[in-house]
A protein has these predicted regions:
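N-terminal secretory/targeting leader peptides
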Residues: 1-171
Length: 171
């Protein structure tokens, strides 16, 4: 029940994470305690004080009514969840080339549409959350948050460290 704008504000908070070591390491790098809890138990865990916060896209936060038990939302942009199309190697090999080409083309054509649709849905969710009385915050010093993530980048970045650096330079 307190706002989080500075990296120091994370200290001592219990943050729900998925049962995945990278997410736990991410939360701990920010100074909080990572608490693995099933998504189905998230509302109750917030309500009871078992945890102090969790990560959620704005649409999920709104539709699951987490704002009733967690009145602050921090737009920290710590992750981007892409939509992906997966096809097994066996299935792909069994498709005729024209169908493979059609699937690849359809995926390319829907990329921008999906990004735009997600951005619009997020914006509508933010507006609805503000109407519900949610305080929407942004980190005061995003660079400090990013620097705190260095150990996580090194641990999990592996062969992608150069790509991570290129992305940083673009920002």
């Amino acid at each position: 029940d307190r706002p989080v704008c500075r990296l120091e504000d994370m200290k001592g908070l219990k943050i729900r994470v998925q049962v995945a070591s990278m997410m736990g390491d991410t939360v701990e790098a920010l100074g909080a305690e990572a608490v693995p809890i099933a998504y189905a138990e998230l509302y109750t865990a917030l309500e009871s004080g078992t945890i102090d916060g969790a990560e959620n896209p704005p649409v999920s936060y709104y539709y699951n009514k987490f704002y009733k038990v967690a009145p602050y939302y921090v737009k920290d942009r710590h992750t981007y969840t892409p939509g992906v199309i997966l096809v097994s190697k066996i299935t792909w090999k069994n498709l005729e080339k024209e169908y493979q080409d059609a699937l690849v083309q359809a995926a390319k054509e829907t990329q921008e549409y999906n990004r735009t649709a997600i951005e619009e849905a997020d914006q509508k969710a933010y507006e609805a959350l503000e109407k519900e009385g949610v305080t929407i915050l942004e980190p005061e010093d995003p660079q400090a948050w990013s620097q705190a993530m260095e150990p996580v980048y090194r641990k999990y970045g592996g062969e992608y460290l150069d790509l991570i650096e290129k992305i940083r330079q673009i920002r």
